[in-house]
């Protein structure tokens, strides 16, 4: 467990701590900029290959496309649990099973779901879960926290 000031810092720390030069990462088009920006920077500066699984017309993750993209040699799969763009939830246990089948790590952005959705890291097979204490869990921040 690692406490950071916010989800953006947690996601940046996790992504930069796991991904190495030349690695391959799979993510989705449903991600927040706190995932996309560090991945884009790693692609530009560290020769990291970043693949993006799409979604259907209703904004739901295309699991078939994700499974095609998650191949041996994939270092990490970075995925949201609930999209801030579409509001759709992602079956993170299903994603974790795909990732672990090829030896990839799973980094989950649970900023929109932690505190309101059940997340069992062990049962779901999640390696890293990042979230904020100010949403869903009703933790106050600042001098009155």
Each PLM stretch: what is its role?
Residues 1-145:
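Pyridoxal 5′-phosphate
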